[in-house]
Amino acid sequence: MAREFSLKDTRNIGIMAHIDAGKTTTTERILFYTGRVHKIGETHEGASQMDWMEQEQERGITITSAATTAQWKGHRINIIDTPGHVDFTVEVERSLRVLDGAVAVLDAQSGVEPQTETVWRQATTYGVPRIVFINKMDKTGADFMYSVSTLRDRLQANAHPIQLPIGAEDDFVGFVDLIEMQAHISKDDLGQDWEVTEVPADYKDEAESLRESLVEAVAELDEDLMMKYLEGEELTKDELKAAIRKGTCNVEFYPVVCGTAFKNKGVQALLDAVLDYLPSPLDVAAIRGQVPGTDEEVTREPGDDQPFAALAFKVMTDPFVGKLTFFRVYSGTLNSGSYVRNATKDKRERIGRILQMHANSREEISTVYSGDIAAAVGLKDTTTGDTLCDEKNLVILESMEFPEPVIHLSVEPKSKADQDKMGIALAKLAEEDPTFKTFTDEETGETVIGGMGELHLDIIVDRLRREFKVEANVGAPQVSYRETIRTAAQVEGKFVRQSGGRGQFGHVWVEFSPNEEGAGFEFENAIVGGVVPREYIPSVQAGIEEALQNGMIAGYPVIDIKAKLYDGSYHDVDSSEMAFKIAASMALKNAKSKCDPVLLEPISKVEIVVPEEYMGDIMGDVTARRGRVEGMEARGNAQVVKAFVPLAEMFGYATSLRSRTQGRGTYSMVFDHYEEVPKSIAEEIIKKQTGA
């Protein structure tokens, strides 16, 4: 199968936004106008084409970035839908990593919202060019110029309108194209029929003044144009367009367009802007990588004649075809049925079928080309962030880093049948999502799942029930406490058993002392003169390490502790590895009364973004949660509070913050370090754990 669209005519874009800016509806309309969907699916009726997981349809939010392919005016546009909720930032990062450009959707009433800032920052980190679509122009309170000003104030973005809306709220009927200086007026409900006319008289002055500032801003990006502009020459439309494209591709300029996806206005013009201003794979710098096992850096240029290199950016379990691995091809081509090397894991993979995905239907293709996004069926060892490449030209493209889970809860299957299914289901979910972890608690035998926040785990439990038909009881969220010691002490551990036949004899003296924070466990053998024979030393270390896992006061693992074995004795006949192991664990038990053991709790670094008027309330709440405010800063017209707060106090915070700020506050939280639990609280935890 020959290549259908050239690299120059390919666009890989993402649609990014705050949770309710209308991102999914915008994607939906793009699919409608590009002929991929015959009936428009509405998010608030729960039938959107992109939101294909049941929970997404119920909650009306987008969780998984589905990759879809569409065609517009002889170009292929691959669209990745990204979630806008703070618990899913890993999905956003993952999709930004493989995009060449993005459309940032804003709500015309709110402008830049806090989650927009988060996503915008992530896009800046990855150097992703953006155009801005100010959506919901039909909404009460819609204000185009206010929204543009929030881009400049809150994001310090060099953003300029290339359209001016005609009317607003219920009177929004179209826009003035500031480059062509023509008005586009919508003539029907589906937005298929547009009339292009002269700019209405009452919009002329504003349109001319906006065009003037657009020309000036564009001229600043290009020396030749600047000279022409200063000499009073008129810039041609083609020069303007070329300069806007260059500025956008260099991430120095952000063109702004407007519309209402829900009312079908402005989406075709948005698609035109995607073709005009966002980069093709040829406009983006060649991707860098390393030759496995060396420090040698190599680049992969976009082109079908180059060696094959691709990045897997999403793994999903599909009810019909099994495991799907979404990947972006950076160079070369790939045929179904061929073999490639997973350079990250150093494994050979056979590519079974290759599918081009459209939100929830799929088309089988035999070849993918450079710049394409597709999904492969049948990959065994590939997970998110892995590089797939030609077996003779190995390369590892930069990988993605994922944060550790901050919240855990236990899940207990309701029946024996659920037990077996649950293990398989959790393994599949962990494969799809690198920020989700699962393990068995050795003491209680419970299965524990960990993730990035409460919504994250809610959705995992929901998927267990729906997709994998596993019924499970869910425990309350739990914090991972730790223990350590505050004073050094020398303690004895002696295990003697003599009752006919061969006895047991192990005897050690160990000095336990606090280690530096984060240094973990250190063991030192200071035996001289063979008072404890060399072959028993590893058993002493193993005995202490095992005992540390079971805790000293409340059964939580002991961290940051040194153990120095400096004396002891043995018996020629009765001593054994087991006897010394037990003696060592008894030494740790005896240290409890001498070493001043304490309980530690995880402390999260929390950043809360709220409008000024809620500051007092939020600060008071942070203090009430035993938090320590480290600093504050203004960000646009919002305030950012930076604080350290115990994780145990942060459960339910998303809901609490939402109600305190009428949904205008957002927060992000990452684990930072462990700190001692205040005595009164520690006593309660110990009592609960030990039943004493």
UniProtKB/Swiss-Prot annotation:
Database matches in Gene3D superfamilies: 3.30.230.10, 3.30.70.240, Elongation Factor G (Translational Gtpase), domain 3, P-loop containing nucleotide triphosphate hydrolases, Translation factors
Q: Where in the cell is it found?
A: Cytoplasm
State one molecular function term (GO).
translation elongation factor activity
- InterPro entries from the UniProt entry: EFG_II, EFG_III, EFG_III/V, EFG_IV, EFG_V, EFG_V-like, EFTu-like_2, G_TR_CS
Q: Which keywords annotate this record?
A: Cytoplasm, Elongation factor, GTP-binding, Nucleotide-binding, Protein biosynthesis
- One GO cellular component term: cytoplasm
Give start and end of each tr-type G domain: 8-282
Q: What is its main location?
A: cytoplasm
- What's a single GO BP term from this record? ribosome disassembly
Detail which positions bind GTP.
17-24, 81-85, 135-138
Q: Which domain of life does the UniProt lineage start with?
A: Bacteria
What role is this protein assigned? Catalyzes the GTP-dependent ribosomal translocation step during translation elongation. During this step, the ribosome changes from the pre-translocational (PRE) to the post-translocational (POST) state as the newly formed A-site-bound peptidyl-tRNA and P-site-bound deacylated tRNA move to the P and E sites, respectively. Catalyzes the coordinated movement of the two tRNA molecules, the mRNA and conformational changes in the ribosome.
In the record, the note on similarity to other proteins reads: Belongs to the TRAFAC class translation factor GTPase superfamily. Classic translation factor GTPase family. EF-G/EF-2 subfamily.
> What's the protein here called?
Elongation factor G
Q: Species name for this entry?
A: Shouchella clausii (strain KSM-K16)
